[in-house]
């Protein structure tokens, strides 16, 4: 026997499928601001490089272009998710657009790490002369811009207070791009100082190789997190256990239970229960009230003698 949920109005139906993060608009606005700052820096570097014929400035500008692209992808994902939040063509809302953008930016980070490592290894084998006097202020300026942008993209106070492991991955990806670049700038400053002071020509490529390893570590971490969300990996064994315990608190048997992410701070659950004396679905749904982050629940309740053919078919 299956007990269906009571019918809902269209407005309620749409509201139930808006699974955006609590700070969605704030994060979208700040991501666009940071993208604009990086774009302005990019233009300044390219114009300055062309005017002074400095390859270092032009190279730094092209490097900044990768960050601008990553930030535009992140900001566009916010805008699209918000614009289509009520579009019923998306069965479970648009909250996962941020995970998709985060995954794409993680791939860019990984490719960047590989290219950095290749260039650094080549320069370790055959060190090239570096204009330390010109390169130091460029690295320092890049670090200042990155620190400003990192501050702008910091999580909100409420998010930090909750230590939410299922926070906004799109923001995390943009933040990691800038954090990785800031780390590269710090390593570059140290290497350039060592090269200028002690003549260590190997310091610059060695710092580049270390930075590549750091960026690669960031990329792998982000790929795992975004990939898990996109592939509907169970996000929380603790929440799954709590749902199971609450649904079976009256002696019912939980035959099937699935939990997955819908968006930042939002989860969905599907459960199949078997009860000797089935109650209306709202009776069991009430047991799950108050569970933070559980935004969508689908329940199927069967009597003890229900035909197994009514169950799900897991291929």
Report residues per predicted region.
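Alpha-helical transmembrane segments and adjacent TM-loop junctions that form the membrane-embedded core
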Residues: 2-20, 26, 62, 70-80, ...
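Residue-level marker of regulatory loop/turn positions in helix-turn-helix DNA-binding domains and
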Residues: 25-29, 50
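First transmembrane helix
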Residues: 31-48, 145-148
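Residues that recognize and position ribonucleotide moieties
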Residues: 33, 55, 169
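Active-site alpha-helix of zinc metalloproteases
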Residues: 38, 55-59, 172-173
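Interfacial helix-loop-helix junctions of multi-pass membrane proteins
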Residues: 47-58, 126-129, 133
């Amino acid at each position: 026997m299956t007990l269906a949920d009571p019918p809902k109005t269209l407005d309620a139906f749409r509201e139930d499928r808006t699974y955006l993060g609590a700070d969605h608009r704030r994060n979208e606005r700040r991501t666009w601001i940071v993208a604009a700052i990086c774009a302005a820096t990019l233009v300044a570097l390219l114009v300055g490089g062309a005017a002074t014929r400095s390859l270092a400035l032009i190279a730094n500008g092209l490097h900044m272009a990768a960050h601008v692209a990553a930030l535009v992808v992140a900001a566009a994902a916010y805008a699209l998710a918000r614009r289509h939040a009520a579009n019923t063509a998306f069965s479970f809302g648009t909250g996962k657009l941020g995970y998709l953008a985060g995954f794409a930016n993680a791939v860019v980070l990984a490719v960047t790490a590989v290219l950095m490592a290749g260039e650094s290894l080549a320069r370790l084998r055959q060190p090239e002369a570096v204009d330390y006097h010109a390169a130091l202020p460029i690295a320092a300026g890049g670090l200042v811009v990155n620190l400003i942008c990192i501050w702008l993209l910091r999580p909100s106070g409420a998010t930090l207070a909750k230590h939410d492991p299922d926070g906004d991955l799109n923001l995390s990806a943009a933040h990691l791009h800038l954090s990785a670049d800031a780390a590269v700038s710090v390593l570059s400053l140290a290497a350039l100082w060592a090269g200028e002071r002690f003549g260590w020509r190997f310091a610059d490529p060695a710092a580049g190789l270390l930075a590549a390893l750091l960026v690669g570590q960031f990329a792998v971490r982000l790929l795992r997190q975004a990939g898990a969300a996109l592939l509907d990996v169970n996000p929380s064994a603790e929440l799954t256990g709590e749902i199971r315990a609450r649904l079976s608190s009256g002696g019912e048997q939980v035959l099937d239970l699935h939990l997955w992410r819908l968006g930042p701070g939002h989860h969905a659950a599907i459960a199949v229960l078997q009860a000797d004396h089935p109650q209306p679905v709202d009776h069991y749904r009430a047991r799950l009230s108050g569970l933070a982050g559980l935004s969508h629940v689908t329940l199927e309740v069967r009597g003890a003698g229900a035909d197994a053919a009514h169950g799900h078919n897991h291929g």
